[in-house]
Structures are given as C-alpha cells and as structure tokens.
Swiss-Prot record:
It catalyses: 3-deoxy-alpha-D-manno-oct-2-ulosonate + CTP = CMP-3-deoxy-beta-D-manno-octulosonate + diphosphate. Belongs to the KdsB family. The gene is kdsB. GO terms for biological process: CMP-keto-3-deoxy-D-manno-octulosonic acid biosynthetic process; lipopolysaccharide biosynthetic process. It comes from the Bacteria. It comes from Escherichia coli O139:H28 (strain E24377A / ETEC). One of its GO terms (cellular component) is cytosol. InterPro entries: Cytidylyl_trans, KdsB, Nucleotide-diphossugar_trans. This is 3-deoxy-manno-octulosonate cytidylyltransferase. Its EC number is 2.7.7.38. GO terms for molecular function: 3-deoxy-manno-octulosonate cytidylyltransferase activity.
Amino acid sequence: MSFVVIIPARYASTRLPGKPLVDINGKPMIVHVLERARESGADRIIVATDHEDVARAVEAAGGEVCMTRADHQSGTERLAEVVEKCAFSDDTVIVNVQGDEPMIPATIIRQVADNLAQRQVGMATLAVPIHNAEEAFNPNAVKVVLDAEGYALYFSRATIPWDRDRFAEGLETVGDNFLRHLGIYGYRAGFIRRYVNWQPSPLEHIEMLEQLRVLWYGEKIHVAVAQEVPGTGVDTPEDLERVRAEMR
C-alpha cells in the first residue's frame, strides 16, 4: 500500500527554541523522526520546515525537504502547502508524523496509513487506553470517545466519558472506557485541500484542538487503538532530558 509521510518541523518553539535541532544522543531530533518514518515503509518522506538550518540537517541525513512559510497556524496548514507544492493527487494517502516524536514506533505510522486506505473517509488517527486517573484528569492528555464502528464522537481535554458512579465515589481508578488520542494523522490529499478552506470552528477554539473542525463540518475520523504505545514526545526541556535517557 502506497503512502507518503510528511513531518512538519517548525523551528520556533516557546518552550524549547530550535526544537527540531536539539541533540539527542548525537543526532538532531528531526533526524531521529526521519529514521522512524523510513522504517515504516513509506514511499516518500518529506520534512516540511520554515528554517534553513533544519533543512540542512535533514538533507545531510539524506532526507527530502519542502520549505514552507513561517506563518502557518497549524501543522495541517503546513501540510496543505506541501500537498500543493508537490501536486499530490487527491487520493494520495498522507501520514502526518509530528517532528517532536523521536520515539514513535514505525508500526503505528504504517497502521494509520493502512486504516485510512481501508475506509472511505478523509482522515484517520490512533489512540491508546488510559489506565490511571492522573492521565484521565490531565487536560494535556486529549481524550476521545468513539461510536460502535470506531469513529470519533468527540475529542476533549476534559475527562470523557464521565464515569458518574465511579467518580462520585471518589475512586482513584478508572475503568476500561478511556482513550488518549495520539497526535498522528492519516489523510487523503483531497481532504487536506478541503480542510484548509473551512473556517475554524467554535469548539476548536474552546478546546484548542484542530481535529474538532473536522467533526464540526460533519466529516468522520476513524480512530484505532495503536498497536504499540509511543514513547515520550518532546515539548519541554524536561521531556528532552527524559527522552535522552530513554534512548541512551
């Protein structure tokens, strides 16, 4: 099955300036992500960046780069610029792998591409079970609830579904109904072209979750449980030190 991986790698980061180029055990982080993507069997891998230093690091590792504007409001908008510059056909399957996920398993990159290819929807993503209350109540862990066919009903930073009886009793354990969304997406190129022409939705602004725009406009997102749980992503200096230790 043919698919393309696009890795958005924005240079500016409030909490970790120059994030794509931070060193992890002798390599820039973006090169680690590129290597994981290569292991997925993708037909083509493109790093989308707004900074020449990132481009040079990727090219030195034998990777392909697409230079993009620096003013994009989201990773999906950056993807859309690449889709147009590369003139991908509308049915091309594209997987968006975040540039700050150096420990992402190649298996789940392939999984999200396969899931999308098997369904007549524009978008697919993955989730993992939540087993502890700390994560269930953490607003930085995005929760998702699904219908009987595995399509997203809603994504939220709130604790959904709300387990009325268990939480009313003050229990610190959670049941088997909680899923944490992973920030990996598969799209068809034609869907990306439509997405960027939609106005942002009120729910998207409230939750600060751009995938809610898709549900707002009546489109479906398929969500599968990931075959492997990815390692730590890098958002903060503390995350970076943790990843360095785990990858040592």
